[in-house]
Amino acid sequence: LHILHLASGEGVELIRAAKDKGIKVTGETCPQYLMLTDEDGERLGSAMKGYPPVRGQSDQEKLWEGLMDGTLSFVCSDHAPHLPEEKRKPLWEAPAGCATIETMPLVLLDSVAKGRLTLNMLVKILSEQPARIFGTYPQKGAVLPGSDADFVIVDMGKKYTFSQKQMHSRTKLSP
């Protein structure tokens, strides 16, 4: 059983309890749930509308705890590239979802820079764990002889400012 797009601390607790009982279950969350809280709603409006909705600070902390202790297996993009004019509609009319495929690595690398994650943990949650869970490891998710050479080189000493103008997605709007 795989539970996707966890946004609540209660969901993390349910997965943890199931694992403690020996139930084979995995779960993941998305960058918006790790980086935003319901307090960002006034500033971002419909841009952060998603299903499930972004929750409070305590839920966010439990998501981080679940990610760090292995209760949650990885972070996925849940990329939903709606046009800016669609996302600027009133909350109940705007489509749900965020354009996160381009920003996910950046916000998680920022978490590495701030000491919340290690680079090794980042590799595990973005590459190794998804490959293991979905049966593509070690062809994917590993740097080993015979594996696909899918990797990214980053310079953690270099400062980088992301701009919406740099986005390649259909939308140039990402929380």
Language-model-detected regions and their locations in the chain:
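Short, glycine-/Ser/Thr-/acidic-enriched flexible segments
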Residues: S8, Q32, A80-H82, K158-K159
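A short acidic, glycine-rich active-site loop
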Residues: M48-S58, P95-A99, L173-P175
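Short, surface-exposed loop/helix-turn segments at secondary-structure junctions
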Residues: L91-W92, T161-P175
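Glycine/Thr-rich phosphate-binding loops of Rossmann-like dinucleotide-binding domains
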Residues: G11-V12, M35, L83-E85, F162
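His/Asp/Glu-enriched, well-ordered alpha-helical/loop segment
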Residues: F74-V75, A80-M156
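A structural signal for short secondary-structure junctions
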Residues: L67-M68, L144-S147, S169-R170
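Histidine/acidic residue-rich metal-binding segments in metalloenzymes
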Residues: H2-V75
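Short amphipathic alpha-helical segments
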Residues: I15-R16, K87-K89, K165-Q166
